[in-house]
Amino acid sequence: MDFLKLEHIHHSYYSSTQAKEVLRDINLDIREGEFVSFIGPSGCGKTTLLSIIAGLFPATEGKVFIDGEIIAPHNQSLIGYMLQQDYLFPWKTIEDNVTIGLKIMQRDNKTHKVTANALLQEVGLPHVGSYYPRELSGGMRQRVALARTLAVNPKILLLDEPFSALDYQSKLKLEDLVVETLKAYQKTAILVTHDIGEAIAMSERVFLFSANPGTLHKVFEIPSALQQLSPFDVRQHPVYSEVFQTIWKELESLG
């Protein structure tokens, strides 16, 4: 079942002297519970498209449907956003950071502590609720950011290069955690990344965009043999290098 549907998305940025077209006629469908990645050269509009899906601003033309409804303020709570920066409030405890979305949405505060503790346990940080962000490493803070995103129980997660600021070891561990957690919670997810290997390791499909303006160039289905593995193990599988080379050559052909 298609959970997210984009129809004829066009977007341009306007200044006093010119208009710059950044997205042209984007049409795509993402199934409920599916994990996909958006990749492409700089200028292909990946982050702009993610922002339109999130409802941060409307497309110049076209429609975004989530769960059969056009994206609007009343259903934006279905969407969770995780960015490269964790954006934790430094003056709040980790527990308070995890539950900040629940408080903003005025959910029952009697369950906030239970929710925070359960999610911190889920992301491998069971004893840090009373800590402050400055006391945690970058990888740990991104785990907290994941817990905070999940706290409001979104149906779809938008991940905008959330691992790019981490060291390689932390990145690999967090990739595994994100995929495992989102599968357990049966969440739909879109990852924006420049890293082809990351896209292959985490996704069921990879959407390749061309630039200037951004258009959907090609969609790659990741082999089922890789989809069953953790991101770390995907990179060890002999099929991985074949898929990588295929996508790399297609990306190179875009110039």
Predicted feature descriptions by range:
Residues 95-103, 113, 221:
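Short helical segment in ABC ATPase nucleotide-binding domains corresponding to the A-loop/adjacent helical element
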Residues 146:
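Hydrophobic anchor residue at the start of the ABC signature
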Residues 131-134, 152:
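Conserved signature/switch motifs of ABC ATPase nucleotide-binding domains
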Residues 39-41:
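The feature captures the beta-strand-to-loop junction immediately N-terminal to the Walker
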Residues 62-74:
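Conserved ABC transporter NBD signature motif
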Residues 54:
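Helix-to-loop junction immediately C-terminal to a conserved catalytic motif
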